[in-house]
Amino acid sequence: GLGDVYKRQAQRALSIMLNIKWKSNYFESIDPVEARRILDEELFGMESVKQRIIETVIQINRTHTLPAYGILLVGPAGTGKSQIAYLVAKILKMPWTTLDMSSINDAEQLTGSSRIYSNAKPGIIMEAFNMAGESNLVFIINELDKATSSNGNANPADVLLTLLDNLGFTDNYMECLIPTSGVYPIATANDKDKISAPLLSRFAVIDIPDYTREEKKTIFLKYSLPKVLKRIGLHENECLVLDDGLDAVLDYCKDTTGISC
């Protein structure tokens, strides 16, 4: 009967809570030299972006807590915003999860459903804590500027506010307040003007400029090509790229921002 269903769901909620290691929000120091090495190894140029990330590391080392504000990376498509987000998670030595706001159009996807329903389940956010097995977690929020509701239901952007305000997050399935002091959000967006003011106020904005033609050439030869060759099992001396060939590729992709062509 309904009682058995509710009992099973209550047991599941309890097992999820017991599975998560609830950590203190004391944060160990991060080596800024190692952080810089990680950034330089994966990112070409972007000096101002790297500097902002190192400043965040220094702030963490000073306070031994995560900053009150997350990072919002704003720029055209293909400029490496998601890659930067993953690198920050790597530098912080924290597990990470992604929320793709372009595919979330109903707040219940984030908050879960009430246990009064037989098909009830926790929301994406609670499942992320469960998968990570700990409460210190980087949330990489892709396309924050798409965090709106398209079908009249509660706005997912409002739910994100409760995740980011450090007062605790309520999942309808769990029926209790989830501590969020160990949550660090890193969001990406193409257009910050489409993000609500309350949500925008939770982030330090870092602008990611598009690459120049010369920068795209360097990135292709020194970063993209070696990675592709390694993936398909070729040595660099087995693939010769002529200047004319590279120019032809860039001309073909001239209407595309970034390097995602």
Label every model-predicted segment.
Residues 15-19, 23, 30-74:
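Pre-Walker A (pre-P-loop) alpha-helix and adjacent loop at the N terminus of AAA/AAA+ ATPase modules
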Residues 24-25, 133, 191-201, 205, ...:
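Conserved C-terminal "switch" segment of AAA+ ATPases
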Residues 69-101, 130:
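Walker A/P-loop
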Residues 75, 112, 143:
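The Walker A (P-loop) glycine that initiates the GxxxxGKT/S ATP-binding motif of P-loop NTPases
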Residues 91-120, 128:
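AAA+/P-loop NTPase substrate/partner-engagement loops
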Residues 132-140, 171-189, 237-244:
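AAA+/SF3 P-loop NTPase mechanochemical coupling elements
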Residues 143-179:
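Conserved catalytic/switch belt of AAA+ P-loop NTPases
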